[in-house]
Regions:
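Phosphate- and other anionic-substrate recognition elements at nucleic-acid/protein interfaces
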Residues: 1-159
Length: 159
């Protein structure tokens, strides 16, 4: 089974796991849109990442973190996040891929990461997958770690 783990949002990430092994991990592809140079998810690039890794012989699952609005988050920020989330859902629908949603508390509890900082998920992934530590060397790579753990959670609990 090939599992795509997705931490949605402009600073999110996409991971690809097969047989509990991390095949690849990407920062969320973005592009600049409009006169105000606002970033948004590059749907075409996300589509290519997924399509190029689909093997018709294997079962596919796309697992997306299901996040709600956070207190103190502005209206524009919530709209942008929702737009990114919608792009990912649309891509999966267009490609006829099964999409599953997991709340952050579910996958974080599975890995004992409740009430920890963002750095903890990166540390956890490096412990489990030391061979990819070079891909997670920056602090901002915690989003890549989240995407990996989202896919791994699905693998551990659903497969």
């Amino acid at each position: 089974m090939i599992i795509f783990g997705i931490d949605p949002g402009l600073s999110g990430a996409i991971s690809v796991l097969e047989n509990k092994k991390v095949i690849e991990v990407f920062d969320m592809p973005t592009m600049i849109d409009g006169k105000k140079n606002k970033r948004q998810v590059n749907g075409a690039h996300v589509t290519n990442i997924i399509k190029e890794r689909i093997d018709n012989e294997k079962e596919i699952a796309v697992v997306v973190e299901h996040v709600n609005a956070m207190p103190g988050q502005g209206v524009t920020s919530m709209f942008n996040f929702g737009q990114s989330f919608g792009v990912i859902k649309g891509i999966c629908s267009a490609l006829s891929l099964p999409i599953y949603f997991v709340r952050p508390t579910k996958w974080k509890k599975h890995f004992n990461l409740i009430k920890t900082n963002k750095e903890a998920s990166r540390t956890k992934v490096i412990e489990v997958y030391p061979e990819i530590s070079s891909k997670l060397h920056r602090k901002k790579d915690s989003n890549k770690a989240d995407a990996i753990l989202i896919a791994r959670y699905f693998n551990d609990t659903q497969v």
